[in-house]
Amino acid sequence: MSRTVSKLVINNLDLYYGEFHALKDVNLDIEEKEITAFIGPSGCGKSTLLKSINRMNDLVKNCKITGDITLEGEDVYRQLDINQLRKKVGMVFQKPNPFPMSIYDNVAFGPRTHGIHSKAELDDIVERSLKQAALWDEVKDRLHKSALGMSGGQQQRLCIARALAIEPDVLLMDEPTSALDPISTAKIEELVIQLKKNYTIVIVTHNMQQAVRISDKTAFFLMGEVVEYNKTSQLFSLPQDERTENYITGRFG
């Protein structure tokens, strides 16, 4: 019988922006090679937690964090420097944000930053990453054209390829399909499910149907708290907290 392994452990995490208590005693075990969805109304702390995992909140003035986030047993705030962490944890944002450079250079950007400059090695990384992002066949003949000429859906898959190029352990996705049309959304969802074979994925989504379609576990956030965390099928079919039931049935949110 296979045993699940916690890749990320969030323990007694509190986060303040000045006097505002944005995350309240959050405790989550995020398991390896699973898709974990964060759902909840706007402003409930989903994206704040995502940004805490890869320390994007380091740049926010008056942000104070207590508690622990560990990645494979290492504290991301006390034991990993920011460059180590960013190599282990990739991030894909809500709006596609390709760099104003070629498709090739977008994907090669991270590996170059981490010291890889061999053309042969970069060629292999770019091809592998674009294939993983289901984009290679669409762009292999125009790798040196600007990424800004791609469609929105292609740009988002390019951003996924760029994140994968550094071979992270964890991929964080902050509403990656909210700016896309339904066809592009379906492609991204299919891609995310495929990526689960090799990566631990955490996705923030406002689309509850999306959480049902792609995630193994779901955490429901409300006013900075994790109200409920369970297997997705159980959380949506038999919620244990009345607030979860009210949210997923559309009574608020």
From Swiss-Prot:
The similarity comment for this entry is: Belongs to the ABC transporter superfamily. Phosphate importer (TC 3.A.1.7) family.
Provide the ABC transporter domain boundaries. Answer: 8-248
**Which compartments does it reside in?**
Cell membrane
What domain of life is recorded for the organism? Bacteria
Query: What role does it play?
Result: Part of the ABC transporter complex PstSACB involved in phosphate import. Responsible for energy coupling to the transport system.
A Pfam family found in this protein is: ABC_tran
Q: What is its main location?
A: membrane
Q: What is the name of this protein?
A: Phosphate import ATP-binding protein PstB 3
Q: Which CDD domains match?
A: ABC_PstB_phosphate_transporter (cd03260)
UniProt feature coiled coil, ranges: none
Catalytic activity from the UniProt record: phosphate(out) + ATP + H2O = ADP + 2 phosphate(in) + H(+)
Gene3D superfamilies membership: P-loop containing nucleotide triphosphate hydrolases
| InterPro entries documented for this protein | AAA+_ATPase, ABC_transporter-like_ATP-bd, ABC_transporter-like_CS, P-loop_NTPase, PstB-like
Q: Give the gene name.
A: pstB3
Task: Enumerate the Gene Ontology biological process terms.
Answer: phosphate ion transmembrane transport
Q: What EC designation does it have?
A: 7.3.2.1
GO MF annotation: an example: ATP binding
NCBIfam families, A to Z:
3a0107s01c2 (TIGR00972)
